Swiss-Prot record:
It comes from Acanthamoeba polyphaga mimivirus. ANK repeats lie at residues 44-74, 79-109, 115-145, 202-231, 243-272, 282-311. Keywords: ANK repeat, Repeat. Gene3D superfamilies: Ankyrin repeat-containing domain. This is Putative ankyrin repeat protein R748. It comes from the Viruses. Residues 525-579 are annotated as: Disordered. The keyword Plastid does not apply. Residues 533-544 have a biased composition (Low complexity).
Length: 877
């Protein structure tokens, strides 16, 4: 048939074929065929199951099924859908009736498509009551089968129908509440008992789905079936309400006042929340949810309940609810007047309204999408994983020597690992996302923290050893940005808490996404590549593992697993330059096995027998296993005796002994690894080189910024090596007298009084007042590609916090700003010799670098040379 169509298409005037002749030809072809290919099955599906129905389509399908009845269970598209799947999803009732009546003995009702929906699940979801009864009579055990998302048969009965239709002109099918009740009654007649307490991978049951999508009559039917609504909460938490046995709180969250009233009338418990585990202050969780999500009608109703009246009699609880209302942006004066404590005035009211802008949430979600593929299709699980990682980091920072803190950290780690086992994301993606939130690209900090707290042997060690580990973790660079971590944690928790509310819509597409726990409508589109890829054989194991991990968490003795409060920390500046030391991953190597042997002469320094251990990144190994491949290389360098005054020569001779002590210490060789976040920052910093026209040197600068040059950085100096492990640059530390001038300059940035006189003087500072954010168009131009201009670009990442000589002058383009001229004292390998001088940077008030040059010492301005002479304790010469 396929060849016949192609032959006809190639002719200019194809011969018209009568439909009856086509059926006869197809019948003949079927008689001589021994098997059908997937392409042929898909072609017949395209002819029969799309478009409007006619008798010819049924004739073709009957011819196929009479010859090959087993093809009813054969998947033919990328989503592994069968003909029965497609007939149900497209609501071709005549084909469904034909398959169920004529091929009932050949149908495997447990056959799943690629997203884990079986034939019986599809029949129940679309409300084919007569055929449901036929199916459960033939295969009673199929009623207990779960989907790949852990959904049981009752959930498919109450959730909306999946909008998986090929005919775009058709309206999505909606089951009536009467149909849902009849389906539940039909399923209850099965000889196989239904598991009423089964929870899907999101942690909720069928009754929670009914609270969201169905009427109160469906709730009554489920309760008569045996569902319990009097279960206690799993944790002393407010959010999430959907998987914490808080039906009233969940109904309040989705703003279903009719369901709230009905649940209270039939005896559903109003759960009380301990606002602090150290006291007995209780508040209804549904009231907190209603205030947080601004459900005004529910608030008015809940405020009249006896539990709410008793709670509001306490001024502490009143203040707690008032803070939630102001932060949520409540503008209802009647509600505010009932919640406002008597001691509050207008000033305190304004102070408590510290809400985040919508753009802040959008920025965080954009960063998540940049690091995690298909984020919006699996929002809940990914947000939950990121929230757990941020909670781990904040708990490490706040760790004190007690069992409860350690238990909380361990429990959070278990929860994070359970989420990651669901294959919705990877641990490396979470690392990169958290690092992106705080502009900290040193992923090994986060990796080291997680590897440490997830190591059961370390967590079971003595208190002294555990404290040492936590002290070492608190010294990592990631915790210098603790304010950003806490802010990001609060933002992610807000997104997580409002996930169900945000997705609530009357649109059927949104209902469809929520019907599938992964929210992945494209999973059902037969014309797209599938996203969810779960093996049917592994389905039960994954679900059992998930349930076991949930039970471990639920059986914890620590019931008071409170919602994370906003901890207060000292305000500190989190602004960091765009191109900086931590734009790349750095991993410290093990101490070299051999000591460093130094040979010093009067006028030169020889360095021999350095044994480095190079760190390579291996995604399939843990952090401890990443250290491998020992590289032994003889590195020699010779420093010439340049002309310099006697004072500096004496200083050089006095520092030889200090050099010996420096090189006798273990060297920590740091290697770089290109990451997605690295590429993002590099690409952003080169904006001026590609807009509006891409310059010729763009690729050169990009390659230099992403070069993998190793370096060694300690308190005294920086050593930079090339790819052959040869020393090519040194930067020495300078003695710092005081940073008072530096602080004064920062505080008086926009002060125009005597600005020129005060800012032009030279100062030795502990770090530059500003650093590189963008590269200007003249960097690496045709006349700036000599060795002096092309010194290692890795220094642009690691000098942002290094002592330097700085001169600040008025910005001619922006008169209110100040430009910085920076000098870093060191040596550079030029023509095989180490030349002493200064690495010079010129950075304007907008943090754009216009000039980077290594200037030999004899070419330095006299005032720079005099300042260098005044600096004491140059560690290496």
């Amino acid at each position: 048939m396929h060849n016949l169509e192609n032959k006809n298409a190639s002719n200019k005037k194809p011969k018209k074929i009568v439909v009856s002749d086509l059926i006869a030809i197809l019948t003949y072809l079927m008689e001589i065929k021994n098997k059908m290919t997937n392409k042929e099955l898909w072609k017949i599906r395209h002819i029969c199951l799309t478009g409007s129905y006619n008798n010819n389509q049924m004739s073709i399908m009957k011819i196929l099924m009479n010859k090959f009845p087993k093809t009813i269970n054969v998947p033919f598209d990328k989503q592994n859908n069968t003909y029965l799947h497609q007939s149900i999803f497209n609501r071709h009732k005549i084909f469904v009736d034909f398959f169920m009546n004529e091929l009932n003995d050949n149908i495997n009702y447990r056959s799943k498509n690629k997203i884990g929906i079986s034939h019986l699940h599809a029949l129940v979801n679309y409300g084919y009551i007569d055929h449901i009864e036929t199916a459960i009579i033939k295969d009673p055990g199929a009623i207990q089968q779960l989907s790949d998302d852990g959904q049981n048969i009752l959930e498919f009965a109450v959730i909306p129908c999946f909008s998986i239709i090929s005919n775009k002109n058709s309206e999505p099918y909606k089951k009536s509440n009467t149909t849902i009740i009849n389906i539940i009654k039909t399923l209850s007649k099965s000889i196989t008992k239904l598991d009423l307490q089964s929870r899907n991978k999101m942690g909720y049951r069928a009754i929670e789905c009914a609270v969201r999508y169905c009427s109160t009559d469906v709730i009554d039917e489920l309760i008569s079936l045996g569902f319990s609504i009097n279960e206690s909460r799993l944790k002393n938490r407010i959010f999430p309400t959907i998987n914490n046995n808080d039906l009233i709180g969940f109904a309040t969250q989705i703003d279903r006042l009719d369901m709230v009233k009905h649940l209270i009338n039939i005896g559903a418990p109003i759960h009380m929340y301990h606002i602090n585990k150290h006291n007995k202050l209780l508040v209804p969780t549904c009231l907190v949810v209603a205030i947080k999500f601004k459900r005004d009608q529910c608030i008015h109703y809940l405020l009249n309940l006896p539990e709410s009246i008793q709670a509001l009699s306490n001024n502490t609880i009143k203040k707690y609810l008032f803070n939630i209302a102001t932060n949520a942006g409540c503008t209802n004066h009647e509600i505010i007047s009932k919640l406002c404590p008597k001691t509050y005035d207008d000033k305190k009211l304004r102070k408590n309204c510290n809400r985040y802008k919508i753009s802040v949430f959008e920025q965080h979600e954009n960063k998540i999408e940049r690091n995690i593929k298909n984020y919006y299709k699996r929002r809940f699980m990914i947000l939950d994983s990121i929230s757990n990682m941020l909670s781990i980091l904040c708990s490490i920072y706040n760790f004190s020597d007690n069992d409860s803190d350690l238990h909380k950290i361990t429990r959070t780690v278990v929860s994070l690992e359970a989420n990651l086992l669901l294959k919705y994301t990877t641990i490396n993606n979470v690392y990169e996302t958290v690092a992106d939130f705080v502009d900290h690209i040193e992923l090994t900090d986060i990796q080291y923290c997680f590897e440490t707290v997830s190591n059961s042997e370390i967590m079971k060690a003595s208190d002294c050893i555990i404290n040492e580990y936590f002290i070492s973790m608190k010294k990592l660079g990631i915790f210098k940005k603790i304010n950003r971590l806490i802010k990001s944690k609060n933002i992610i928790n807000t997104l997580l808490n409002e996930f169900d509310s945000d997705s609530e819509s009357t649109d059927d597409d949104s209902d469809t996404k929520r019907a599938c726990s992964c929210g992945c409508q494209s999973c059902y589109d037969s014309d797209e590549d599938p996203v969810c890829d779960s093996n049917e054989s592994d389905n039960s194991n994954d679900i059992n593992n998930h349930v076991k991990s949930d039970n471990k968490l639920n059986s914890s003795n620590d019931y008071y697993d409170e919602d994370d409060s906003e901890d207060n920390y000292n305000n500190q500046s989190d602004d960091e330059p765009l191109v900086k030391n931590d734009v790349v991953n750095t991993i410290n190597t093990i101490t070299p096995n051999q000591n460093l042997e130094n040979t010093f002469n009067e006028n030169n320094v020889m360095i021999n027998n350095i044994n480095f251990e190079k760190t390579l990144n291996n995604k399939h190994q843990s952090f401890q296993d990443n250290i491998c491949e020992n590289i032994s290389e003889n590195i020699s360098e010779k420093i010439p005796n340049n002309n310099r005054d006697n004072n500096c020569n004496n200083n050089h001779n006095n520092n030889i002994q200090g050099d010996k002590e420096l090189f006798d210490k273990p060297l920590h060789l740091q290697y770089t690894r290109l990451t997605k976040l690295h590429e993002h920052y590099i690409h952003k910093s080169l904006y001026k080189l590609r807009h509006p026209i891409k310059l010729n040197q763009y690729d050169t600068v990009y390659n230099l910024l992403t070069s993998l040059d190793p370096y060694v950085k300690n308190n005294n100096n920086i050593l930079v090596f090339n790819s052959d492990n040869k020393l090519i640059a040194k930067i020495f530390s300078l003695s710092i007298k005081s940073d008072t001038d530096y602080i004064n300059d920062i505080n008086s940035e926009n002060d125009n009084v005597n600005m020129y006189h005060e800012k032009t003087k030279l100062q030795i500072r502990s770090k530059p007042s500003r650093w590189i954010r963008f590269y200007s168009q003249n960097i690496c131009g045709l006349d700036k590609q000599d060795p002096n201009h092309m010194f290692p670009f890795v220094l642009d990442r690691i000098l942002n916090d290094w002592p330097c000589i700085e001169r600040r002058i008025r910005d001619k383009i922006h008169p209110d700003g100040l430009d910085s001229l920076l000098y870093f004292y060191g040596e550079l390998l030029i023509n095989g010799e180490m030349i002493r001088g200064c690495f010079e940077y010129f950075i304007n008030s907008n943090n754009s670098v216009f000039h980077r040059l290594f200037r030999e010492e004899y070419k330095l301005p006299q005032n720079i040379r005099d300042t260098l002479d005044e600096s004491i304790n140059v560690l290496s010469y």
